[in-house]
Amino acid sequence: MMHTTSTPACLVVAAVALIALADATPAAAQGNIWTFEDLPYYEALKADPRAARMTLIVPAWSKEFPHSFEPGNRFVWQITVGRELPILGFRSQRDDGRAGNKEWGAGLWIPVSFHVIEDFKDESAPIVDTDYRFGFMTKFQYGLTEESWLGIRLVPWAHESTHLGDEYVIIAQRPREGRLPFERVNPSFEYLEYGVSYERLFGEAMLTLRHGGIRLHGDDGYYSDHLLGSDEPTLTPSEKNFEPSFGVEWRGWQRGERDLFVSVDMRHKLAYKFHRAPGEEETKHWSFSVAIGRTVPERTSGVPLRDYFVYVYRGVNPFGQLREQKDYWFAGFGWTFGI
């Protein structure tokens, strides 16, 4: 579903106008305006499961999916292809790194990402789910001291769409004892997301503390009130449409040319309940992502492999329609690529 809103159009017009202003500003006055520079104002945590970046998790293992035919845990892999595209912004100090003491910087980014997970246990190794997201993002960073920073991130509008794979759906439609008939639902929604960050240096190590949240636009919830291909309202819309999150990351202990890191992301996620009896409450559950590995130092360029790590997820299944699965786990080895 796509909710009508003028926010994206206004942001596009503002971005074009600011780029034109930057091009028309005399060179001596352009020190505080930047365009298409990837500045480190609010970098996603390594454990953030929704980050727009290039990440491959393989080899990996997963709990059985809700509609899998072959029972038991399975070998899987998942890939995220994405990027936060920097457009333009302002800064009080001409510096290509973090904001200095009592200095600030702000800008506009366009986050775009595409995610796929594949199951190798069921017949034909089906694509289980594909998700994509795009939107508009503003970031702000203020230097509290020479060694600490306040960061703010706001996504005023973004769209997320999720789709089960065709072969997964074919397998899900097979009858299996003790399982209800399969129904295909494609969650699709628009949302606002905010984040607040505190970062502090301890020698050469960096501690990051985060809080954020996602709230849906409109009253439709995460999915329509009807099945795909039908107009009959047979589904109960979601109502608990706010998802808070907390995160912490420690990055330091440099060994060779890379830093060690430990990153944790926690989200209070809604478990979908497509058919609820009158008065029946939806349930939310804490879901955890943990990443432990090594990464290149901040502002490093020309190194294709940015991170490698062990990744573990436990909680509500995060993949589209499969969020009806409350107790899900996934674990594997992750590899993040960049330039």
Indicate residue ranges for each PLM-predicted region.
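Cleavable N-terminal signal peptides
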Residues: V16-A17, A27
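N-terminal signal peptide c-region/cleavage motif recognized by signal peptidases
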Residues: A22-A24
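Bacterial N-terminal signal peptides that target proteins for export
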Residues: M1-V13
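Transmembrane beta-barrel domains of Gram-negative outer membranes and organellar outer membranes
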Residues: Q30-Y142, L180
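Short loop/turn motifs that connect adjacent beta-strands in outer-membrane beta-barrel proteins
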Residues: Y42-L45, I87-L108, L144-L150, E199-T208, ...
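Outer membrane beta-barrel transmembrane domains
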Residues: R215-I339
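Outer-membrane pore/translocation modules
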Residues: A99-W250, Q325-D327
